[in-house]
Amino acid sequence: MLEQQADRVMELSEWSQRWQENKIGFHQPEVHSMLQMNYEAVVNGRSGVRWFFPLCGKAVDMKWLADLGHSVVGVEISEMAIRQFFQENNMTFSEEDVPAVPGAKVFQNSEGSVSLYQCDLFSFSSAVAGQFGAIWDRGSLVAINPRDRDRYAALIVSLMAPDCRYLLDTLLYNPELYKGPPFFVPDEQVQSLFGSRCDVKLLQSVDALTDRQRAWGLDALTENVHLLTLKAAN
C-alpha cells in the first residue's frame, strides 16, 4: 500500500505558496479534539512541560498549551504562518536571526512561552533548542515526503528528552484513491519507524471522514493517535 505514494514529493516552496494563496484546509481554527482528549496522557502529572510542534503552521493548540502554563517551540517554513499565529492571537513578539541555522529566524512572544523557528525542519536540531518533554505531531509526519520518513523519525527521536511523551496523529485511507498530502501512514510503519527506539501505544482511533476528504475521492478515513515513549536504556 505504501508504494502508491512512495515517490510523491512536495517542495518547501509549494508549502509556502499554499500559505500565500490561503490554501490551508489543513489548518483547524479550534484546538484539536485529539490533543484535548489525550492531554492528560501526555502531560502525565507534569507542569511547565516544553512542547515541540513540528511543522506547526499557526496551530491554535500552541496558545492553548501556553495558556495552561507550558512552553512551546515550533518549526515552520512559512513566515506568513508564523506572523499570522502571533497576530491572530493578539501576541506581541520579537524576531531574531538564529546563528546556528543560516537563514533561519526565531519569533517569540513577549512572555517567552512560544518560540517559532522559521526554517526547514531538517535544519533544526537539539543543538538549536534542546530536547522536549512532549511532542504534538498533527499534520507533520503525514505531510513530509514519504521518502524522508526515516530521516524524520531519527530527528524526532533526537529531540525527545528521557521523559518525553510523543503524541502522534496519523491517517489511514486507500492511497490508490488519493495521492496526498496528507499521506497515508499505516500503524505498521509507525512501528517500523519508531519501534526500535520507542514503545508505541495506540490511544485512539476514530472515523474522521468529512466532506473535505470525500472531495479528494475518499470513501473512508481513519485518524489514529499514538503515544510514543523512549525505551529504557539497557
Features from the language model and the residues they span:
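Class I (Rossmann-like) S-adenosyl-L-methionine-dependent methyltransferase catalytic domain
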Residues: 2-46, 58-62, 70, 74-128, ...
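Short amphipathic alpha-helical interaction patches enriched in hydrophobic/aromatic residues
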Residues: 23, 139-140
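Nucleotide donor/acceptor-binding cores
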Residues: 48-50
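Class I SAM-dependent methyltransferase "Motif I" SAM/SAH-binding loop
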Residues: 52-59, 140
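Hydrophobic beta-strand segment of the Class I
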Residues: 135-136
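A short, conserved alpha-helix within the catalytic core of class I
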Residues: 143-155
